[in-house]
Amino acid sequence: MNIIFQINGGVGKCILATPVCEAIKSQYPNSQLIVMSGYPEVFLNNPFVDRSFAFGQAQYFYQDFIEGKDFKVFAHDPYLQTEYLMQNEHLVQTWTKMFDLPTFSDTSPKLYITERERIFFSQKFYSDKPILLLQTNGGAQGQDLKYSWARDIPSNVVQSVIEEFRDDYNIVHIRREDQISYEGTITVSDNFRSLAVLIEFSNKRLFMDSFGHHAAAALHKPSTVLWVANTPVVFGHDIHDNIVANPFTKKPELKHAYIQKFDITGNLIEFPYNFESEIFDVDKVIDSIKNQG
């Protein structure tokens, strides 16, 4: 039987889908698992995935995998499930229950990087100092707001971290050209597999809720991860030091909220603090980074 597993979302969601792939294969061991997503490179060398396609690049897919075949499609989005909206269980558990699959207590994602990839890509990241790796901003290209208070790391935190570590570390910043830059950092923008090797190669890491911390968990690299609107209960990993934002200092205006409390892109009127500097305790973040490994 052909099982088509469709993942709608970014690279972080694709990484989170890897334990779901394992659950599918556990339930249907003799099936062929075909993954359709925006980031097929996440699933390369994954022993539980037989084929991985990108949206819009699956010529003759119907004829090859559907027409006249025994097949099953898993395409529902867990973000619309009640359990996800209640935010009281991990997304992987919601996803597997939604498809009536085995639910594992370990929700850790998996990435499979080859030795040749490590050797080739690590040469690009030679550093004369240990590397402190940052991912401070997320979301898709073309966002109106370069900084989302609901998702991204506040500038006062980033600048304090840079000042604290710049003498002893090369501070490498994963960012696209359209994202916020910081003086005193080295910008890196590369393909996913290359960035995964960089994450594995780095000495310390500070992330927000985006693909970086999922990849770090998959590669067994403990990191400091900051959370504002989203919660580590749903998206986090126990390997990390998950620092949740301070209690709100003002009542948010939720005029536009529908089935989720906050717009992850950082709706300006929903901001639940008086000042950006109130979101995190900078000293707590710095201590967490120092205590890594």
Indicate residue ranges for each PLM-predicted region.
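Catalytic machinery of carbohydrate-active enzymes
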Residues: 1-293
